[in-house]
Amino acid sequence: MMKTTYSLGEAIEIGIDEAGRGCFWGPICAGAVIWPPEEEWTEEYREVTPQIKDSKKLSEKKRVAVESAIKALAIDWGIGLVDASEIDENGMTWANQEAFRRAIAACSSGLEPDLLLIDGVLGLPMGDVKYECIPGGDGLYLPIAAASILAKVGRDRWVTEWVNSSDKHKEVAARYDLLNNKGYGTAKHRDGLKAHGAHGMHRGQFIRNWL
């Protein structure tokens, strides 16, 4: 079973993770989750918690179901998006950190975190708030795993809703197989770039070798 907290005591810890960092197209998305300590769990928490895992280890259907439970049970949660134009203008490190900031800002409870638990090696200076970078944290700490699910499902949902919002968007998606690859650089996506060139929501720095 994953750990629910990093430190002892009553520190407010927020788990943070991202999805879409390596995509060719579309935004990077971050999730942020504050999960209650184990001593506060009801039976409902005990049923849901074993299902919260690194998002990559869950099927799409399972991720969506668990995402709903996380949103219902978390003390607080938020999602932050940074689009492709911002990534091209400011670079991926900035974009990744900005997605983290936006996810934290989207939390609505008003609680001020004492500690950020961040998956990976990229820190996030935020004044007096401490942070811990934890490689593989989405497989070790429950709040990070929950954040990884929110980020993955949130980004996939954003792509699907964008595609289905107009016939023009559906035509764009068909060129690059976006509904299936969600913007990642699959073989079909690369073939689409060679055949049609770039779309306005492609990340220029990511695709230059495929044009």
Language model regions located:
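RNase H-like, Mg2+-dependent phosphodiesterase core
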Residues: 1-211
